[in-house]
Amino acid sequence: MVRKIKDNSVSIGSDHRGVALKNYVYDYMIPNTDEEPTKFNISVMQDVGVYDSKKAIDYPDIVAKVAMDLEYQSHGILICGSGHGVTMAANRYPHIRAANCRTTKDVKLARKHNNINVLCMGADFVSKDEAWKMIRAFFTTDFE
């Protein structure tokens, strides 16, 4: 079976510890008006949750939702407290190449050399400013 993947489409999710950073990243990526194009020419952007930082959730549940979306979407972003849990869970899926990144340099290397399609971040270690730079690198760095 051949699956058709939508170019520059993204599914984003987090556990309860990553909600604030996920919301920041999501809000950064969507256009301010209907006429404004999305940043990085995103054709589809799906927020799979969670939406409440006070309600604990098992991160594998969110990873499963992003993994399902990546059957037809090109990119995924996963956020938890450290980034390690979502990375390990994501890499269990055969169509996912995930890396836990903490710097823009990490993202660029992972895209260039490993062709990651899922960026994982730890909300306890990545600032909003660094996350913004990492997202930009994720969508603008090509595999060599």
Task: Label every model-predicted segment.
Residues 30-35, 43, 68-72, 112, ...:
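Generic secondary-structure signature for well-ordered alpha-helical cores
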Residues 76-124:
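Mid-chain, well-packed structural core segment of small domains
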Residues 20-32, 36:
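Short, solvent-exposed amphipathic alpha-helices that sit
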Residues 60-82:
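Short, structured active-site "lid" loops
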Residues 22, 63, 86-87, 131:
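A general structural signal for well-ordered alpha-helical segments in protein cores
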Residues 4-5, 11-20, 24, 104-144:
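C-terminal binding/interaction regions
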Residues 13, 45-49, 76-80:
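Short, conserved beta-strand edge motifs with alternating hydrophobic and charged residues
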Residues 38-59:
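A short beta-strand-loop structural module common to alpha/beta enzyme folds
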